């Protein structure tokens, strides 16, 4: 039996290049309930890598792909923190939305 969950995770890394913020929200009631928040700061070398992508250079596509993979790992860290801190399992999450 598949149970429809009302738990969602939102992730965002903004233009400030400082890190990723995440939220676990329960939409089961009339008013959404923020169940947990978590964030992770970017390492200084990752910030330098992202900043360098704003200028023309060698291997831009390769460097952008490496940055995307590193960003995905930070997203995963924040999701893990949200789940661990709330006692919610990954199977209980209906969807994850990410922007950044």
Can you annotate each of these PLM segments?
Residues 1-100:
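Short acidic/glycine-rich loops and adjacent helix/strand connectors
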